[in-house]
């Protein structure tokens, strides 16, 4: 009998567990920026491609080096692949620092293993170049093809990474040193948590130094001098306070049968019964052979057999205040399958018997 995996999120009461401000919020404007670029990977051992856009890019690269191919010449670029290069530019990155990059094939290349990324410009949302990437790829996947067409692929050979593969050429401006206030944005919006964070800052700095703007933002008065502002933030982000209890949630992975239950999830009184039905369809092909002198034709006649089996469901009652942990144990005892539990949870939610959010992924 298959048992469900239950992960009980021990979300302790706010009075018993404190958190640092830096663990629940971040300074507004201090964030990563996504970069993207188009480039070529060369040096592949015959696992590249020869698509129109790859050939065009290859010719453009040769022209940039002063090499002009004769008109009508089509290069065989089986050792070249067109790729998209992506990276995250961290906040406060300076010119000359390096960042990691991910390289992904966009054509029909079989593998990027053993390839070298040619110089690629990485641009931001504004179209400006912020970093330049180049280097040898590290590919964890592999692929092999036999003479008879058989093929084996492990992991993903068309995606690779280059550690410190891009050099930062342009810095991203941020509003860290502007104005008289700094805003903290909560990772999880909650009015109670926002107010408690503001209260903790006011208790540390003095009254009216911080205020909750909404469920996600807390505005804090800060010194204008940058050096003082850094020291100020260092002290503030390490303050401990008691966040609000997390919202009652049930996260169910229907593919693995994993269930994550929040501490505050409760069930109202209900009675549950669930039966299972199995439909088996069997196709048989019968041959109709006519008499040799009859002049008829041999035909294949399909014969379909359908069998329906239904097992009787067991009923169990949920008492007031029962937790979802108790429900899952009851479902396991009656031998339900993962799909059965999904149906039971959805039905309980529709009946209003679950006090919390049900999220199925």
From Swiss-Prot:
Cystine connections: none
Role: Assembles around the rod to form the L-ring and probably protects the motor/basal body from shearing forces during rotation.
Gene Ontology cellular-component annotations: bacterial-type flagellum basal body, distal rod, P ring; outer membrane-bounded periplasmic space
Signal peptide region: 1-18
Localization annotation: Periplasm; Bacterial flagellum basal body
Protein name per UniProt: Flagellar P-ring protein
Family: Belongs to the FlgI family.
Residue intervals passing through the bilayer: none
Gene Ontology BP term (one): bacterial-type flagellum-dependent cell motility
Keywords, sorted A to Z: Bacterial flagellum, Periplasm, Signal
Lineage start: Bacteria, Pseudomonadati, Pseudomonadota, Gammaproteobacteria, Vibrionales
InterPro entries per the UniProt record, alphabetical: Flag_FlgI
A GO MF label: structural molecule activity
Domain of life of the source: Bacteria
Subunit structure: The basal body constitutes a major portion of the flagellar organelle and consists of four rings (L,P,S, and M) mounted on a central rod.
UniProt cross-references to NCBIfam families, sorted A to Z: PRK05303.1 (NF003676)
């Amino acid at each position: 009998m298959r048992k469900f995996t239950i992960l009980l999120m021990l979300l302790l009461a706010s009075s018993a567990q404190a958190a640092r401000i830096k663990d629940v919020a971040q300074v507004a404007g201090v964030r990563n920026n996504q970069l993207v670029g188009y480039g070529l990977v060369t040096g592949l051992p015959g696992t590249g491609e020869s698509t129109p856009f790859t050939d065009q890019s290859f010719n453009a690269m040769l022209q940039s080096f002063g090499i002009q191919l004769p008109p009508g010449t089509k290069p065989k670029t089986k050792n070249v692949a067109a790729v998209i290069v992506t990276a995250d530019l961290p906040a406060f990155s300076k010119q000359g620092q390096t960042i990691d990059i991910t390289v992904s094939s966009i054509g029909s290349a079989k593998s990027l293993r053993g390839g070298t990324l040619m110089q690629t410009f990485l641009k931001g949302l504004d179209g400006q170049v912020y970093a330049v990437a180049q280097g040898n790829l590290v590919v964890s996947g592999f692929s092999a093809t036999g003479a008879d067409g058989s093929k084996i692929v492990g992991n993903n050979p068309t995606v690779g990474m280059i550690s410190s593969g891009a050099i930062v050429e342009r810095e991203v401006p941020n509003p860290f040193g502007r104005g008289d206030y700094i805003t903290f944005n909560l990772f999880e919006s909650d009015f109670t948590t926002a107010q408690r964070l503001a209260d903790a800052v006011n208790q540390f700095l003095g009254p009216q130094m911080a205020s909750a703007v909404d469920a996600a933002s807390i505005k804090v008065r800060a010194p204008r001098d940058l050096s003082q502002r850094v020291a100020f933030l260092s002290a503030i982000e390490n303050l401990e306070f008691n966040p609000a209890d997390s919202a009652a949630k049930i996260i169910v992975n229907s593919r693995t049968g994993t269930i994550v239950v929040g501490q505050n999830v409760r069930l109202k009184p209900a009675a549950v019964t669930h039966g299972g039905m199995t439909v088996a369809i069997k196709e048989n092909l019968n041959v109709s052979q006519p008499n040799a002198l009859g002049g008829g034709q041999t035909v294949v006649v399909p014969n379909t057999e359908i069998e329906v089996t239904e097992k009787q469901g067991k009923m169990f009652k949920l008492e007031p205040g029962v937790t979802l942990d108790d429900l899952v144990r009851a479902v396991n005892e009656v031998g339900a399958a993962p799909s059965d539990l999904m149906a039971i949870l959805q039905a309980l939610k529709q009946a209003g018997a679950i006090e919390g959010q049900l999220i199925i992924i």
